[in-house]
C-alpha cells in the first residue's frame, strides 16, 4: 500500500492517486464536544508541505465517497484504503467513546450512505493515544445500534503513538479487538528514525501468536529510506511523494517481491509468503 500522506482537501485525492497512491491518510480534528470537525493537520507539519489545507469533515467524506464508488464520475479504482489520523489528543480521555460514536455516525451518513451503495474503501481508524481505546468501542457500538454492524468488516485499527508493542496489545485487549490491526511506526519527514521498532512489529506480525496483521512506516520521501522499509518487510509506506515509492517498487530487487495492492487484497489478512 502506497499511502498518500496528509490528504485533507478533496482536490488532493485525485492528485495523490494520480501519482501512484492506492491509499490516503487524512487528518481529522475534533471540536470540544468530540464531534469530528475538519480534515486538518495544522502547523507544524512535514517539511515541504502546506499544513493548512482543510475541508469540513462531512464534506470531505462526501468527496471521498464519490472517489471510491464504482460508476461515479469521480471514481478512482485504485484507491482502496483510507487511514483517518484521528487528532484525538485535543480531547479529554473520557471523551474518546463519544468521539468514536460521532465519527461512526458521520461515516455512516456521509461515506457509507447508510449502507446504500456508499464508498467501498477499507478504513483504518488511527488513534494517537492508547488511553483512547474506547474510541473503538464507541464506534463499534454505534454501527450496531444504527443497524449496520456488517460495516465493521471494512474497518481496521492503528495506534500511532510509537508505543511499546506489548502496551499496544493490552489496549486492543481492553477494546475487544482481535483482528484488522495495522501497526504504524514513524516520524515526520523532517527527522530521521531507525527501523528497530518496525522490525519488532514485523516480527510480531509474522509470529504464530502475534496480534498485528499489517505494518506501515511513515513518512518516507526518499528512495534510500523506501528501500530500507521494504527490506524490513513492511506492508505499507506513507509518503508525500507516491511516485518515489512507485519507482523503487519497480526496481529489479523489489518488483518480484512486492506489488501494489488492489481492492481484491484483504488489508486485514496477514500476508503469507
Swiss-Prot record:
Q: Which cysteine residues pair off into disulfide bonds?
A: 45-51, 47-190
Give residues annotated as binding Mg(2+): 25, 27, 85
Q: What is the protein's major site of localization?
A: secreted
Q: Which GO terms describe its molecular function?
A: lyase activity; metal ion binding; phosphoric diester hydrolase activity; toxin activity
**Keyword field contains Glycoprotein:** no
Which positions are catalytic residues? Answer: 5, 41 (nucleophile)
Where, by tissue, is this protein expressed? Expressed by the venom gland.
Task: Tell me how the cofactor is bound.
Answer: Binds 1 Mg(2+) ion per subunit.
What are the TM regions of this chain, as residue ranges? Answer: none
Localization of this protein: Secreted
Query: Which top-rank group of organisms is this from?
Result: Eukaryota
Q: Which GO terms describe its biological process?
A: killing of cells of another organism; lipid catabolic process
Q: Which cofactor does it need?
A: Mg(2+)
Q: What is its EC number?
A: 4.6.1.-
Does the keyword field hold Lyase?
A: yes
A GO cellular component annotation in the UniProt record: extracellular region
Q: Which UniProt keywords apply?
A: Cytolysis, Dermonecrotic toxin, Disulfide bond, Hemolysis, Lipid degradation, Lipid metabolism, Lyase, Magnesium, Metal-binding, Secreted, Toxin
Q: Report which reactions are catalysed by this protein.
A: an N-(acyl)-sphingosylphosphocholine = an N-(acyl)-sphingosyl-1,3-cyclic phosphate + choline; an N-(acyl)-sphingosylphosphoethanolamine = an N-(acyl)-sphingosyl-1,3-cyclic phosphate + ethanolamine; a 1-acyl-sn-glycero-3-phosphocholine = a 1-acyl-sn-glycero-2,3-cyclic phosphate + choline; a 1-acyl-sn-glycero-3-phosphoethanolamine = a 1-acyl-sn-glycero-2,3-cyclic phosphate + ethanolamine
Function of the protein: Dermonecrotic toxins cleave the phosphodiester linkage between the phosphate and headgroup of certain phospholipids (sphingolipid and lysolipid substrates), forming an alcohol (often choline) and a cyclic phosphate. This toxin acts on sphingomyelin (SM). It may also act on ceramide phosphoethanolamine (CPE), lysophosphatidylcholine (LPC) and lysophosphatidylethanolamine (LPE), but not on lysophosphatidylserine (LPS), and lysophosphatidylglycerol (LPG). It acts by transphosphatidylation, releasing exclusively cyclic phosphate products as second products.
Q: Which family does it belong to?
A: Belongs to the arthropod phospholipase D family. Class II subfamily.
The name of this protein is Dermonecrotic toxin LdSicTox-alphaIB3ai
Organism, scientific name: Loxosceles deserta
Amino acid at each position: 500500500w502506497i499511502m498518500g500522506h496528509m490528504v485533507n482537501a478533496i482536490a488532493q485525492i485525485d492528485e495523490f492517486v494520480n501519482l501512484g497512491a492506492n491509499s490516503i491518510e487524512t487528518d481529522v480534528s475534533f471540536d470540544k464536544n468530540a464531534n469530528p470537525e475538519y480534515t486538518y493537520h495544522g502547523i507544524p507539519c512535514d517539511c515541504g508541505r502546506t499544513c493548512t489545507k482543510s475541508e469540513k469533515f462531512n464534506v470531505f467524506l462526501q468527496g471521498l465517497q464519490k472517489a471510491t464508488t464504482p460508476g461515479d464520475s469521480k471514481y478512482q479504482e485504485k484507491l482502496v484504503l483510507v487511514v483517518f489520523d484521528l487528532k484525538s489528543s485535543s480531547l479529554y480521555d473520557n471523551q474518546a467513546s463519544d468521539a468514536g460514536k460521532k465519527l461512526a455516525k458521520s461515516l455512516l451518513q456521509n461515506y457509507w450512505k447508510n449502507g446504500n451503495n456508499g464508498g467501498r474503501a477499507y478504513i483504518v481508524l488511527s488513534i494517537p493515544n492508547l488511553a483512547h481505546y474506547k474510541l473503538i468501542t464507541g464506534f463499534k457500538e454505534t454501527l450496531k445500534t444504527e443497524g449496520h454492524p456488517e460495516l465493521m468488516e471494512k474497518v481496521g485499527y492503528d495506534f500511532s503513538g510509537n508505543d511499546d508493542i506489548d502496551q499496544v496489545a493490552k489496549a486492543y485487549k481492553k477494546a475487544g479487538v482481535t483482528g484488522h490491526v495495522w501497526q504504524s511506526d514513524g516520524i515526520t519527514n523532517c527527522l530521521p528514525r531507525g527501523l528497530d521498532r518496525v522490525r519488532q512489529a514485523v516480527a510480531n506480525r509474522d509470529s504464530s501468536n502475534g496480534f498485528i496483521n499489517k505494518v506501515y512506516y511513515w513518512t518516507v520521501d526518499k528512495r534510500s529510506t523506501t528501500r530500507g522499509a521494504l527490506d524490513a518487510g513492511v506492508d505499507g509506506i506513507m509518503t508525500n511523494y507516491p511516485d518515489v515509492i512507485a519507482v523503487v517498487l519497480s526496481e529489479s530487487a523489489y518488483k518480484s517481491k512486492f506489488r501494489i495492492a488492489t481492492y481484491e487484497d484483504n488489508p486485514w489478512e496477514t500476508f503469507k509468503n
